[in-house]
């Protein structure tokens, strides 16, 4: 026996006490729980939760070790009452032995769905808060952009200003081109008028200004078209008369010169 743990139940006489469950109005009850499978991820240092619903349905929620997925393990089943079963409880520190009646036997199976226990509800609340805190920036990031919600960028403002300036410059250039075309047309018309005036002046016959004996000619508007040959004829006659006078003067000069020579 050296090096081995002492036996839990030594062969000696003990005092057996009856527990509170043997009273007429028991203040506590004892149950047995039978699992079909108990995972190693269950944290035995933490407390679990047991719920009894309608129809003797039982839900047991046990927390898993921190970092496990999922965070809890859920069992569901039913309970059946015991008739004459008892449980012996031994306190090895004090050596006390106590006998208690069993109230019911609970048989449960592990399920994948999450239970509705208080522990699970608290865990769900914490997870929901974490999801909400992480979902808020994601919603803002992934929300579709709207033209009315977000202000335009500085590049868009500059582009609009450049387009407005370009349209103004186009309008000014079009107005300048129209004014240039009008001025060029007016200058061309004035040049045409001046050229036509010069042609009219060239077409008009030149009248001798050194003839005082000629009568002034009537205006062109008063002269009929048939009078144009008569004007030319009178002009020719005036030239002949002037030539005759010049001949007479030359002959007079010759006679005067010859007379002066004879006197000498």
Swiss-Prot record:
Entry keywords, A to Z: Activator, Nucleus, Transcription, Transcription regulation
GO CC annotation: nuclear speck; nucleoplasm; super elongation complex; transcription elongation factor complex
Domain of life the protein comes from: Eukaryota
Keyword match Nucleus: yes
Keyword Nucleus: yes
GO molecular function: transcription elongation factor activity
Stored Pfam families: EAF
Chain residue ranges for the region called Disordered: 114-154, 169-264
Record's subcellular location: Nucleus speckle
Swiss-Prot/TrEMBL GO biological process terms: positive regulation of DNA-templated transcription; transcription elongation by RNA polymerase II
UniProt feature, compositional bias: Low complexity: 173-196
Biased composition (Basic and acidic residues): 228-238
Polar residues bias (residue ranges): 117-142, 239-264
Family recorded in the similarity comment: Belongs to the EAF family.
Function: May act as a transcriptional transactivator.
Entry-linked PANTHER family: ELL-ASSOCIATED FACTOR 2, ELL-ASSOCIATED FACTOR EAF
Name of protein: ELL-associated factor 2
Gene name tied to this protein: EAF2
């Amino acid at each position: 026996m050296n090096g081995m743990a002492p036996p839990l139940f030594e062969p000696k006489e003990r005092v057996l006490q009856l527990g509170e469950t043997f009273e007429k109005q028991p203040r506590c009850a004892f149950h047995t729980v039978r699992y079909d499978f108990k995972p190693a991820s269950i944290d035995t240092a933490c407390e679990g939760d047991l719920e009894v619903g309608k129809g003797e349905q039982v839900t047991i929620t046990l927390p898993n070790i921190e970092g496990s997925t999922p965070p809890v393990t859920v069992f569901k089943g039913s309970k059946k009452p015991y008739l004459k079963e008892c449980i012996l409880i031994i306190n090895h520190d004090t050596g006390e032995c106590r006998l208690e009646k069993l109230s019911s036997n609970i048989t449960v199976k592990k399920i994948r769905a999450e239970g509705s226990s208080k522990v699970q509800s608290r865990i769900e609340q914490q997870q929901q808060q974490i999801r909400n805190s992480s979902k808020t920036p994601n919603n803002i990031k992934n929300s579709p952009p709207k033209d009315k919600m977000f202000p335009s960028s500085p590049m868009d403002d500059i582009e609009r200003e450049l387009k407005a300036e370009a349209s103004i410059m186009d309008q000014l250039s079009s107005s300048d081109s129209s004014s240039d075309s009008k001025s060029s047309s007016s200058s061309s018309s004035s040049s045409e008028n001046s050229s036509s005036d010069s042609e009219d002046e060239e077409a008009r016959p030149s009248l001798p200004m050194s003839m005082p004996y000629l009568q002034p000619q009537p205006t062109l508007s008063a002269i009929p078209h048939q009078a144009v040959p008569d004007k030319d004829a009178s002009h020719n006659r005036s030239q002949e008369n002037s030539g005759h006078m010049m001949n007479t003067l030359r002959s007079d000069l010759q006679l005067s010169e010859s007379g002066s020579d004879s006197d000498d």
